[in-house]
From Swiss-Prot:
Active site positions, chain numbering: E136 (proton donor)
Catalytic activity, EC: 1.17.7.4
Family membership: Belongs to the IspH family.
Enzyme class: oxidoreductase
InterPro entries for the chain: LytB/IspH
Residues binding (2E)-4-hydroxy-3-methylbut-2-enyl diphosphate: H48, H84, H134, T175, S233, S234, N235, S278
Official protein name in the record: 4-hydroxy-3-methylbut-2-enyl diphosphate reductase
Amino acid sequence: MSADKQKLTIRLCGPRGFCAGVDRAIQIVVLALKKYGPPVYVRHEIVHNRYVVEGLQQRGAIFIEDLDEIPEEHRERPVVFSAHGVPKSVPADAQARNLFYLDATCPLVSKVHKQAMRHQRLGRHVLLIGHAGHPEVIGTMGQLPHGAVTLIETVEDALHFPPPAGVELGYVSQTTLSLEDTAEIISALERRFDNIHAPAAESICYATTNRQNAVKAAAPGSDLFLVVGAPNSSNSRRLVEVAERAGARRALLVQRASEIPWEEIADLSVLGLSAGASAPEIIVDEIIAAFADSYDVSVELAITAEEPENFPVMRALRDVELTKADMAFVNGVG
């Protein structure tokens, strides 16, 4: 302990960082590279995290946004669909091109797809609570015919969208939303439509719920709350909002320790720290080390749940063995 350093308590949230769906998606790309060799194409960022994407690029993954970007001479190479899910048109397009694809869609996102399709199969118009333009929303809307889904982003949308005549309604939601915001939208829908149908199971995933609850526990009284995550990560941005609502004096989203605005955050006593579901633990460690350079740091754990969940990869990749270094990367610690 150093006498000339100000004391800083870091409230470290648990759970934080990689969830089972993210872990599985990264593992699929690493396993595909091991089994088939580079390059392996990945449609969209496998998860929304620059560190992960750059690490996979170094191993031989090539990230694309459209199947047209795969050159003719590489049409026999594997292509992986991201954890966020894709519209039905994407695998159909891949099949039409005779591409070999591996679908890394999170099983909990696939569950929402099935819930939406069930609503539609039962003759209901589907309301999707989510954010326009997010890949998961694009993928879920793309499971159903054009016009079969209405996107609801706000309570205002819930109160004023024109419902189709003579059709029952059913709703699902994006898996990474704020629990409170989604509850308000659902409440508005249920007040407006007495017979609206809920999904058979909760759409917001366990990892989103757990990370938000941990932030709620750690944020009150924090001088600053940092969330490790990318600007395009929906669940990470929601954690910043949750921290602010729960009582943090200020909350920021950072991708690396280099983004910490040191000149703006002098004289901290309590720092809250969490990481979005696509952010690796190695960056959390990096941030703690950066604060330890300037402060006498003590770490206080704010653990609100355990996460034993594990999603297996597809059968085609189960015969591949990963090295310790591979597993460290997959688990976000290397």
